[in-house]
């Protein structure tokens, strides 16, 4: 958090801790935000308001945006930070556990047993242990094994949960004598997505727009892609280089991505529930995943790499997709696309022999980053135009790409009129 906070300050952001949104008024040319701060209430004028304030988003509620979905009471999760099992149970090379009375638990992020999910990881001087106890279906309640009055979690409660999940005693201790313990308990699972990602000049990103099971860890990718997608579009509109209608593409692109995460996170949750039927289903999935094509399909789904945006008429297979991971060599310099795409501007990659595509943007060089050279790695294109969020707006595989189409895309997405 400190590193991120310093970075945004370095970029000129006014970061304010301890300030709470209490309301806002929208006008034709801006938003007036009502804030309750440490020194009292005040008003903050802005062009736009972006709510990145989590699953209980005050921004979403004040905007009157519905949050349909489901809240189930079928799960109790417990997390313990700063605790470890006996040292001689841990494989020093792999991190796997050898538990007497149970056997070997692989160092997977989540390990599904017949009666729940278990995870135990140690990274450097930090340690984390998780249990997840689930009912057999989302329609059942699992509320009988914790106190309704939210009694503070104890180490004994964590150990008891581990025993229910694994059927074996696992003694736990602090990672060091003076290490503080952070023990937590969470009830139920929310799977919800905002009915709209926008209301006038107010936008939602991250958990304010969608909540879901954490299994598979898709939330970070999803939320960051929301922010980057909206961020470059807001910047372009506020700078006057793009038409405000560009902002309409935010919800059109990101809400379907959120829907897919809600869908596959529920499916993953179903695959870790207790029961012999689920065990059989997992066995079937294991066989299917031996096929590399199936494994890649699911990997792309969970990571979000299968998202494809509608970027218009360009029919190239890369158009609307995440830019491939390759590098561009020019003379004695080789740079990966990820390095080239850090300016916040559109990136034109020209891989043609005589760099004919790059000349199209010579009169607008201050508004676009151009990289010309030969490809290092697998890329099925001779030229690509990459948006600031990493998605391909235009691509061609022709030795002499059609530059009129490139000009049209530059104008459509970035308001750039190239000669």
Put a short name on every predicted segment.
Residues 2, 6-12, 26, 160-164, ...:
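Helical substrate-recognition/capping region of FAD-dependent monooxygenase/halogenase enzymes
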């Amino acid at each position: 958090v400190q590193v991120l906070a310093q970075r945004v300050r370095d970029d000129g952001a006014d970061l304010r801790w301890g300030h709470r949104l209490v309301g806002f008024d929208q006008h034709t040319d801006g938003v007036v935000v009502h804030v309750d701060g440490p020194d009292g209430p005040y008003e903050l004028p802005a062009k736009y308001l972006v709510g990145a304030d989590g699953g209980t988003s005050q921004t979403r509620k004040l905007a009157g945006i519905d949050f349909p979905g489901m809240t189930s009471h079928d799960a109790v999760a417990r997390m313990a930070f700063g605790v470890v099992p006996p040292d001689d149970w841990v494989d020093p090379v792999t991190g796997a556990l050898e538990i007497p009375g149970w056997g070997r638990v692989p160092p997977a992020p989540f390990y599904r047993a017949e009666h729940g999910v278990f995870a135990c990881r140690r990274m450097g001087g930090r340690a984390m242990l998780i249990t997840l106890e689930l009912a057999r279906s989302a329609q059942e309640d699992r509320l009988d094994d914790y106190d309704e009055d939210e009694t503070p979690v104890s180490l004994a409660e964590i150990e008891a949960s581990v025993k229910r999940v694994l059927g074996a005693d696992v003694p736990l201790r602090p990672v060091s004598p003076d290490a503080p313990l952070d023990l937590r308990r969470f009830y139920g699972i929310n799977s919800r997505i905002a009915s709209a990602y926008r209301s006038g000049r107010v936008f939602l990103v991250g958990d304010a727009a969608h909540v879901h099971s954490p299994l598979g860890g898709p939330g970070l990718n999803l939320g960051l892609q929301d922010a980057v997608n909206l961020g470059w579009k807001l910047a372009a509109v506020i700078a006057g280089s793009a038409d405000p209608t560009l902002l309409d593409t935010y919800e059109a692109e990101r809400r379907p991505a959120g829907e897919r995460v809600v869908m596959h996170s529920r499916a993953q949750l179903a695959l870790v529930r207790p029961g012999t039927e689920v065990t059989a289903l997992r066995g079937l999935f294991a066989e299917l995943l031996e096929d590399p094509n199936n494994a890649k399909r699911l990997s792309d789904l969970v990571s979000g790499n299968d998202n494809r945006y509608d970027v218009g008429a360009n029919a190239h297979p890369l158009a609307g997709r995440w830019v491939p991971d390759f590098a561009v060599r020019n003379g004695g310099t080789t740079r990966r696309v990820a390095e080239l795409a850090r300016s916040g501007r559109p990136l034109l990659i020209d891989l043609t022999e005589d760099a004919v595509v790059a000349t199209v943007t010579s009169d607008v060089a201050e508004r676009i980053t151009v990289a010309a050279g030969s490809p290092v790695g697998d890329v099925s294109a001779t030229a690509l135009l990459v948006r600031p969020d990493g998605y391909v707006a235009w691509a061609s595989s022709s030795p002499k790409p059609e530059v009129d189409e490139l000009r049209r895309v530059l104008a459509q997405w970035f308001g750039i009129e190239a000669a």
